[in-house]
């Protein structure tokens, strides 16, 4: 937006000098400006009088006169006032094709209203090109409820669609939560009008707080209040409470026709009603397809920002980041970016622009099904990335560097760990999108079978990734448990095992004296560990041995006299190895306990076979890191109860006191997955009891 000369006579030089001296080079008051200011100040102190060489390609700025500064300040105040008025005028409901749209003014960044930048030496922790950074001017556009602009309305004002897309996402996209920008206004308007707004849970929200709403991944939540950006008030069944807005995905079609509203057959009006209902269903399918394409474009832009804004800048600073650190922080996100670009290109080719509801997108998901499995590696590495980022951000130079990278790429105000969480969120969102697409796809549609198969395939991919993620989270718990066992012998448990299947107290009958011993048994994949309880301190366990489950046969024994040991047995079973003839007789106190153990042995064999088929394994680095973490956390006396894994999202509740403990919530889950028995089993271990 070009500057305009103010009407009237320009003030005298003395007046302009007075205005200039009243505000001498003030620090910017916004967070992004503060970081840039800090970077420039640090670099100025670092060089200590050395004249920096002018970077190639950067034009020298001409001196700024006092009169120019006064004019610029006057125009800045005028623009700020005008922007404030325009925002009030343009925020309002606009109806188009029966869909509520919202006029949303994208306010010019305050940084573009500051004084012109002078030539400053760059900080040693600043990414290259920081002095090229500037904020483009934006014009108001029409924002749809999903945050996408209506390009038809403002194409003439803004320019090309590509420029419009880049400008939009440099200022107002909403990766962190679904209620960004105009979407939040639309939600509250619908709620105030009495409409029912529904959202689908992306992940489990597990909470012990009676003011928060717990739900499972895939549950449908009625949003009752969305005035807060981070926490919404909702209802599931008979329960109401607060829940994180980032944990849900708003349904594309909120006003769905009820089944009982279908027209009655037998007259011409019914035929017209049937055609109208089909047209409505086609429109809803169009909405879902548009959402899939829109979110994919957003996601590609997001991945490009990470790869170009962070990864590329970090590689230029070999003095700050090693290759191993970069692999830990960013994982294989560049591979994901390449695969997603090919996937989006395939979606665009199959998109019917004239009649979007006839688009056939299911085949695209099937063709790229194998490519989506690379998300497994990324999701498995993400906890390590969080740990490494937490360690680096304790140093101020890394905080400044990451913030400067974000500013240079013109990304929204979210920390790097928040950006890196998006691929994990994305892979969990595909099954929900495909399920909604299948819902509005007629069985006679050419895309019906492909969408149905794609939904099944993406559920399997998400389930596989979720299972691997859960297993990797368990290894820290297993390492901590092993470190609490006294007199441990032999190799570490994690060398062969990664999950606790079952645990409990059994009576072990030894040969040849047929002596009975009470022992605590812990069944892991590939091995069975047994320990002895301390006579005085029952929470202390002593290692006594282990059995290799590979090659062992579990034999169910009837009550009566054992032929080998010649003793009476009850609720017993035998672990027998045919190759060596080794035999171990174990007894439970109750028949139901025996049945649970027999089922646990069957699950252990199934788990081992599944790991072999899927190629799941724990790397040497992961084992060493888990054992190192366990050694650091080991304390004398009774170990404290272990909380949930580090791969968690912590949210601040707006309606609760700030000193209240924040509830940890697992952020990776598959809708309606089979409940894990790990937490139930691990709670039975003595070190994890309170």
UniProtKB/Swiss-Prot annotation:
Q: Which residues form a coiled coil?
A: none
A matching Pfam family? SOS1_NGEF_PH
Tissue expression as described in the entry: Expressed at high levels in the brain, skeletal muscle and testis and at low levels in the kidney, lung, small intestine, ovary and prostate. Expression is aberrantly enhanced in most colorectal tumors.
Show the SMART domains listed in the entry: PH, RhoGEF, SH3
One Gene Ontology term of the biological-process aspect is: regulation of small GTPase mediated signal transduction
* GO cellular component, as recorded: cytosol; ruffle membrane
Alphabetically ordered keywords of this record:
Cell membrane, Cell projection, Cytoplasm, Guanine-nucleotide releasing factor, Membrane, SH3 domain
Outline the extent of the PH domain.
499-606
Any domain commentary? In an autoinhibited form the SH3 domain binds intramolecularly to the DH domain, thus blocking the Rac-binding site.
| Protein name per the record | Rho guanine nucleotide exchange factor 4
Which organism encodes this protein?
A: Homo sapiens
